[in-house]
Amino acid sequence: MKKQSEVKRVSVNLTKRVRALFMGAALVLCLTTANYAAAQAGPPTVFLGSAGTFAVLAYAGVTNAGPTVVTGDLGTYPILSCTGLPTPCTGNGPGQVNGTINAGDVVAQHAQASLLIAYNDAKGRTTNPIGVAGDLGGRTLAPGLYKSTSTIGITGDLTLDGNGDPNAVFIFQIGSALNVATHGRIVLIGGAKAANVFWQVGSSATLGTYSAFKGTIMAYASITIATGATLDGRALAQNAAVTLDTNAVTKPY
């Protein structure tokens, strides 16, 4: 009887250990799956507040040359300068705005305040940053937070792959300037959307001639969109002007 009791006790203990091992393995699998899913989706989005309705927003005015088409609101605050666009801007064209023009009013003021918050949010992200430097042309990047301490260039195509997730977020922290070369492109694949791509630029951003860019640019200084370039996103300048020249700027949805 004593031997049977010992055998039974050993069997019970073994069963408990096996069960504990299975539970531990299941927990590790769940955590790994959750972490993988989070990595696939990238960081949380950047909330733009009232700046989100704007395709173009400047601090020191908006200047346009040529038949630019802006789809979304356009604003400037506190400097009211606005040329080459419809009234209330001076020149009454040749640019076109399919949205509301807010020149120096309280709406533009509130949008600038929201931009400051969004800019600082994007700049302050610190979770799992991926270091990048130099020219990003020719690369394919997954959702994530990308950090550069200096200037970033894009020559050729930079591909952003959403990995099948339409909510995948890409945030780029750029310590200095963003320079997109002539005919440089952002290519979105795998469900990636322009509305979920954010560029926090520590100085000025320049989109080269006939480039095709995607995402919301939040620049500390100026934004220049050269002749024939397109932007599926937003040009939001925190402390300087936005310059346009025969462009298509479309606020993403």
Predicted regions and their residues:
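C-terminal segment of classical bacterial N-terminal signal peptides
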Residues: 19, 23, 28-38
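Bacterial N-terminal signal peptides that target proteins for export
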Residues: 4-25
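Solvent-exposed adhesion/ligand-recognition segments of exported proteins
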Residues: 35-253
